[in-house]
Amino acid sequence: MTLESPSTRLMTCQSSLLPEKPRFLSQKMWAPHLVVAYLIFVTLALALPGTQTRFSQEPADQTVVAGQRAVLPCVLLNYSGIVQWTKDGLALGMGQGLKAWPRYRVVGSADAGQYNLEITDAELSDDASYECQATEAALRSRRAKLTVLIPPEETRIDGGPVILLQAGTPYNLTCRAFNAKPAATIIWFRDGTQQEGAVTSTELLKDGKRETTISQLLIEPTDLDIGRVFTCRSMNEAIPNGKETSIELDVHHPPTVTLSIEPQTVLEGERVIFTCQATANPEILGYRWAKGGFLIEDAHESRYETNVDYSFFTEPVSCEVYNKVGSTNVSTLVNVHFAPRIVVYPKPTTTDIGSDVTLTCVWVGNPPLTLTWTKKDSNMVLSNSNQLLLKSVTQADAGTYTCRAIVPRIGVAEREVPLYVNGPPIISSEAVQFAVRGDGGKVECFIGSTPPPDRIAWAWKENFLEVGTLERYTVERTNSGSGVLSTLTINNVMEADFQTHYNCTAWNSFGPGTAIIQLEEREVLPVGIIAGATIGAGILVVFSFAALVFFLYRRRKGSRKDVTLRKLDIKVETVNREPLTMHSDREDDTASISTATRVMKAIYSSFKDDVDLKQDLRCDTIDTREEYEMKDPTNGYYNVRAHEDRPSSRAVLYADYRAPGPTRFDGRPSSRLSHSSGYAQLNTYSRAPASDYGTEPTPSGPSAPGGTDTTSQLSYENYEKFNSHPFPGAAGYPTYRLGYPQAPPSGLERTPYEAYDPIGKYATATRFSYTSQHSDYGQRFQQRMQTHV
């Protein structure tokens, strides 16, 4: 805005007061008047240089939010007169109170030249250009623009507060911010996250100042958007923080289905449970099940249970769930383990020599199968694929081929397919055949090749025959599925027939085939030999069976003899002492047997026969380690000790029983009676002068009469107290250790830990004997045995 000086305005005002020069008057007539006016103006301007009126502060552009207070300043210097404000050129009035404008008033000190315009509760109508004028001084201020900002009156999302949408169908969310000045800006949020891509437009209202903003956000709802909150925020300079409004989505969608199988891997024939888990909005109305595209009747629940077969591996099971919106179908295959099943069968093939042949065989199995092609009667694998390719085939390639499928740990299956190769006849009979002299014989000629032979002829010696009978010879032809058989039958086979070669020749369209067959004699065993061998084998079987029965019987009988006598209340204490020398006078053996001995014999008599029987069946080998073991072999049941004084009571002495024959090392096998029967075993040995130990041991002779049988002998009495010995040289009789000879012969020399020969080899056995663990070579033998029955 250009400021005008007071002199300039005055001149303008004065010039406007001058009358307009008539057009018809000449310029000379007005010249004096112009000069006078000019002189007056100059006089006035020069007369008032210090009292010039001017604006010290003029109104400026302002921006105010609707409802707020606005003040437009206006300050004049050297002026006392009327001041008024104009709004868009319209005078608001004079004075401080503007009655026509209740929200407007002039404020400030007039003495200070302040004529400020105050506007309270600014409205859109206050949005205008304002000017301050000093009327008497003919002064006008520059124009000030007052801009009133209007926030959006309303922010709204179409369709709220809940918008029902269809899953998968695109939809535009529309937000509107009404009557804002300036136009509002709209921002979208999805669950608090700002969204991009909205399209915004504005509409100008009729007042030309306010605008409505429209924003559209394109979404494609899914079932996951159910309950999702979208927020629209509108803002402008009047409301920097903006206004918000929100809506919630309700998405209708077809069922969302998950189909599961339990168990996931099964064998053919096992039971499987299908479970169809579904969520939908609105609610689910029902279920439908199908297999391989065919509806399964009576299956209308979320679970379907059935026994599976191999078809479930290739034909899917589907579950369809539906509601008002639509339906969802989910399918699955079952991992069924099953044996191979053929899909494409191999076909018999006939071809010519030199052609290429392809044999096809297709299997299915689970787990993945292994496929092999082999030729019959051969283990060579020709192919591992569904097809077997044979190039330039010959008649040797003809035959039966096997297509075998293997499913590990499940099963094996195979199919056979014949391959026929056209060619001359091939005779596959044995070159040497057999017959029995004097009986009827047959010579066979078999042709299995293709095509079948048209003619088959036999030739031998000077004879030729295709079919029929010639003397003793007859030819017959038989057709079968595998080929043609021509049989030459010979009646009453003779020696000359074994010296003849038989020629079998066959013809077909590809040529002839020939085979030479030799007939040999078959040896026939006489009927007597066959019958004898049969009878002998039968007898052998019978005897073997009888021996087995006898063996089992004896084992069972032996186990029954191991019994324990528990009810007899008999206690026998036996003390044996043997001095270094023996008495010379001994009483009769039968007289020396005490009453206790007879009692013991009576007790053991029931076992005597069985002991004698088993005596020859046992042979105990002395273990030299027992010599140094201190453990009681009876586990405490028998108290056998050496170097102990005899008790004063219940002592029974027994005479020594001695065989009259040559003395020898007597290591007889122990009794059959085991420890479980409750009876001890005490090994005893014959005694003789030291000189007798050098003789070669001989088998025992018969026992001396008068009670010399030592089988019931328990101990020997020490006759040292009688100072007499029954044998010459008894004073030098060496001590011995029970169970071991003191001075073994040269053939029996052993180290302390070296095993002796079997005891039964040199001596007989004495029942109820044990070796004393404490007897030594240099001390007197002393044995004490307590028996509790």
From Swiss-Prot:
It holds the Pfam family I-set. The keyword Cell membrane applies. Residues 553-789 are cytoplasmic. Belongs to the immunoglobulin superfamily. Knockout of this gene results in perinatal lethality accompanied by proteinuria, and effacement of glomerular podocytes. Glycans are attached at N78, N172, N329, N503. It is found in: Cell membrane. The gene is Kirrel1. SMART domains: IG, IGc2. It comes from Mus musculus. The chain crosses the membrane at residues 532-552. Disulfide bonds join C74-C132, C175-C232, C276-C319, C361-C403, C445-C504. This is Kin of IRRE-like protein 1. Abundantly expressed in kidney. Specifically expressed in podocytes of kidney glomeruli. GO terms for molecular function: myosin binding. GO terms for biological process: cell-cell adhesion; cell-cell junction maintenance; glomerular filtration; positive regulation of actin filament polymerization; renal protein absorption. Residues 694-712 have a biased composition (Low complexity). Keywords: Cell membrane, Disulfide bond, Glycoprotein, Immunoglobulin domain, Membrane, Phosphoprotein, Repeat, Signal, Transmembrane, Transmembrane helix.
